[in-house]
Regions:
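Hydrophobic alpha-helical segments within soluble ligand-binding/sensing domains
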Residues: 111-114
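Nucleotide and nucleotide-moiety/phosphate-recognizing core
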Residues: 2-105, 116-130, 137-142, 149, ...
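Short glycine/threonine-rich catalytic loop with a Thr-x-Gly-x-Asp
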Residues: 108
Length: 186
């Protein structure tokens, strides 16, 4: 069983912010594969289903971004999922241009507090990640204000395509090697 976790903040206030690209990608996967996100436990909102022959849990931690590791750890433990091979985390990255993807199998948090908390709760940094570019914050902007801000209309169009590509990358990570997925989507 795979756990595909999209990071974000719960609530309508944050739904369309830069920080919620993970949630939006999970919503796309949910719609595309008819997996209802209706279960609420382990500090998360999730649904179970099958994608291309693989059992999956689509997960949106409800702990707020900076505590995402609590929810993910609980789900992994409860369902006995191997985080090194069967956890895929989708999240925003300000070091990438809007719409650009970067697939990785391990690495530091790169300043992302949600990833930092996941690494803390897992005890290591080896898990599959899909970073979705949201663009660099403009000079003079507060980082929190930037990631909790909304995309421009032009950026939103680019982002819709990136959510589709991120969802495709998540599915590919269940079947293909890390190198194959990196070569196709990076």
């Amino acid at each position: 069983m795979y756990v595909i976790a999209g990071l974000g903040n719960p609530g309508d206030k944050y739904a369309l912010t830069r920080h919620n690209v993970g949630f939006r990608t999970i919503d796309l996967l949910s719609d595309k594969y008819n997996i209802s996100l209706t279960e609420e436990k382990h500090k998360g909102l999730f649904g179970k289903g099958v994608i291309e022959g693989e059992k999956v849990i689509l997960l949106k931690p409800q702990t707020f971004m900076n505590l995402s590791g609590e929810c993910i750890r609980e789900v992994l433990d409860y369902y006995k999922v191997d985080e090194k091979d069967q956890l895929i985390v989708i999240y925003d990255d300000i070091s990438l241009a809007p719409g650009k993807l970067r697939i990785r199998g391990k690495g530091s948090a790169g300043g992302h507090n949600g990833i930092k908390n996941i690494i803390l709760h897992l005890g290591h940094d080896t898990f599959k990640r899909i970073k979705v570019g949201v663009g660099e914050k403009p000079k003079g902007y507060d980082l929190a204000d930037y990631v909790l801000g909304h995309f421009s209309k032009e950026e939103e169009e680019v982002m819709k395509d990136s959510f589709e590509r991120a969802s495709q990358a998540a599915v590919a990570l269940m079947h293909d090697s890390m190198d194959q997925v990196m070569n196709k989507f990076n």
